[in-house]
Amino acid sequence: MSDYKFTLNLPETEFPMRGNLANREPEMLERWTKDGLYQQIRDSRIGRTPFILHDGPPYANGSIHIGHSVNKILKDIIIKSKTMSGFDAPYVPGWDCHGLPIELKVEQKVGKPGQKISAAEFREECRKYAAEQVNGQREDFIRLGVLGDWQNPYLTMDFSTEANIVRSLSKVIESGHLHKGVKPVHWCTDCGSALAEAEVEYEDKTSPAIDVAFVAADSKAVAAKFGVSDYSHPVSMVIWTTTPWTLPANRALSLSPELDYSLVEFEKDGVTQALILAEVLVESCLTRYNVESHTVLGSAKGAAFELVRFNHPFLDFDVPAILGDHVTTDAGTGIVHTAPGHGQDDFVVGQKYGLEVANPVGDNGVYKPDTEYFAGQHVFKANDNVVALLREKSALLNHVAYRHSYPHCWRHKTPIIFRATPQWFISMDNHGLRTQALKEIEQTQWIPDWGQSRIEKMVENRPDWCISRQRTWGVPITLFVNRETEELHPDSVSLMERVASRIEQQGIQAWWDLDAAELLGDEAEQYRKVTDTLDVWFDSGSTFSSVVAARPEFHGHGVDLYLEGSDQHRGWFMSSLMISTAMNGKAPYKQVLTHGFTVDGKGRKMSKSIGNVIAPQTVTNKLGADILRLWVAATDYSGEMTVSDEILNRSADAYRRIRNTARFLLANLNGFEPAKDLVAVEDMVALDRWVVRRAAALQQEIIEAYEQYNFHIVTQKLMQFCSVELGSFYLDIIKDRQYTAKQEGHARRSCQSALYLISEAMVRWIAPILSFTADEVWQLLPGERDAYVFTQEWYQGLKSVTLATDLSDDYWQQLLTVRNEVNKVIEQARRDKRIGGSLEAEVTLFADAALTEQLTHIGDELRFVLLTSEAKVLPLADATSEAVETELASLKLLVASSTAEKCERCWHHREEVGTIEAHPTLCTRCVTNIEGDGEVRLFA
């Protein structure tokens, strides 16, 4: 036989080297949809223990961004890995569909409700718009390879969900947590509505900072409290504020009871003034007022001034000095201007003293008609007029521009105000909600663990939750209130159930269309319908009940995991915790996982103006979804997640390493039929048994990392295995055996069996992350199998077998180290042009006694491990001067070019080549593999 090429077992596979993911992935998605893949997975897990990850609903407005992709991919990895662990893990995606952003978009198209269009028509337009947005986002999420019940998602605007949201509110009411009150809330004058905590963003703003004097109603009596008798000059308390527009609503001056205050006298512009300031702030205040010299007349504790009266600087009444724990000396004067209608601390201390909650400002941010001096002016524009009036009244001590962090509307990006309005609140303390919520936080696992202290602080400090909004597109607060007493109807809970039943059939419009007499009969005249809508955070925050408890696929199991961005501690995690604790006395989740925000390669937020936005659609169209998925998995999500084109290209490089490994495995399984060719692990060649043992240990580590949601550990271990144990060692060594051994012989079938077992395991390891690639591999694996890898469980065929005669794992690790040293010396010889490839080399290993014993244990098979034609082991003491030192003190190496003839078939240089008459160009081993029973390998 002259052409021995046909006697080789050359690798062959349909699995292409290039993934061409951008084009192939959509084809796979089409097949997944056609085959009903998600339902196949559900059917495969009937009766199994449920694992419920509840999807926090993104807002149905605009295209998805990279943050959405991170969130959905992380959820998908968890769902798929839990399914692989045998759980019944349904995934029902959801969308948040009510609220202001949708209203604003619809207003741009059809105008405001009640003007060109009726409120009912407006709601219908909002519903249509939200549905369009859901469809667009759904396609983008599906393109990412996220499996779920995409044809039956939950929408907060589904009639059934709207009805269940009303039912959730009724349970909160039944538990006694709802109350109505006039309280200051975050108010956006552009929205004309209250804002939730989560709808407030803080940005820098320049405000007028002013110091204002409030003259004592009885200066002589006030001076006496400082030990000054018969004082004849006016005495004033001084406040510092950055909101001059709130001064018309001032109703008190707050002091700290234990703080020392000084009475300071000075002369300015020929007038003697006496001011009360916190002792520690006297110097900084007088510097602001350009006072060069002063006299401290006396000192007194804040408690001494409780209920002492001071004249309002421009309105015709006086206000009391009161005591509050919120007063600090961080800035200002140590005396706080107190307007209960315009601040939370002011409101709380005002309640204690029974102060009027004055609110001279309308919904649009304009002073009401009866506001003296400023009627009809917008509050922010009125600031200058307030300052001018104070100056005119000689009450202004200082006025400067002050740059500070100030609350802004998340939607309009404009400054908001605190404004007292009649609203509906969930009380944090009336029935112990705060205390119980804090207990529930302790019972929940927070990942990362700093999430616990973060949400604890928020719950400890948060005010009552204002759940009412003055909007058109939202779930109505379906209450009837007595026109005279403002009390709720005594049968509110049962009435709400009747309303919910109507909403279930007709949607929220049923409430607006409802004639009160239909439910209340003769009582209808005594009651009015509430026209407020619910905060959208109530919509999404109640989905553990309105969706999870209502849908059959969740089996009434309750939620195991919430997973969202770290901004949701004060958003969805908070609202869900409050509602669930109010309804059921417990948290709605067992675990809460948060991921960081995406930033660019320089750590900056994504911004169109900077031009650093990475759109997921662009990535999938260019690189493929699996590259994006690999980046998500490989990034530690506990902090900020850095992404750029360069970083994604690095992910593509890492992907190629995994893909090339998969291709090698598949190509070398060509012709392998597991049913008849599989060699039992205990019967394998030692090296094959070792690599299966390594894969079995790795599988346990990978499963554990998946269970702990440490996906970056999964990718690290996978890359290490592909690059080192497989790529640099095992796969390199077995090429010779795989290609040249007898096709049906034990030596080849042993290593094919190892490759098969590793392939079966690895396709499952990568499936939660590289879903498209895993499917591609799965379709080409030999043997009988189900249609999809996603219905499988972790592979059980990886047996960790160690025979009594086996070489230890440490042995193979040592051999890998020796091989690396040999490779370095061979590479140098190649660079020096002393040899061509490694099979032209004969290597002599000078080793100490211990290493010699290890190296000689596998006899002639050492050359197969080192990929050389010859490998001799001699005592370290015999090392010649030409021998090269290595990083191992126990080893020196000498490489020489072989003088033996090269075997035409295996390319090894062997002395016997040319001595076999029938095959003069072959070595003995190749002849045995062609004509005989095949070579015997014990070790490698």
Swiss-Prot record:
Binds 1 zinc ion per subunit. One of its GO terms (biological process) is isoleucyl-tRNA aminoacylation. It comes from the Bacteria. It is found in: Cytoplasm. The keyword Nucleotide-binding applies. L-isoleucyl-5'-AMP binds at E564. Its EC number is 6.1.1.5. ATP binds at K608. Monomer. Catalyzes the attachment of isoleucine to tRNA(Ile). As IleRS can inadvertently accommodate and process structurally similar amino acids such as valine, to avoid such errors it has two additional distinct tRNA(Ile)-dependent editing activities. One activity is designated as 'pretransfer' editing and involves the hydrolysis of activated Val-AMP. The other activity is designated 'posttransfer' editing and involves deacylation of mischarged Val-tRNA(Ile). This is Isoleucine--tRNA ligase. The gene is ileS.
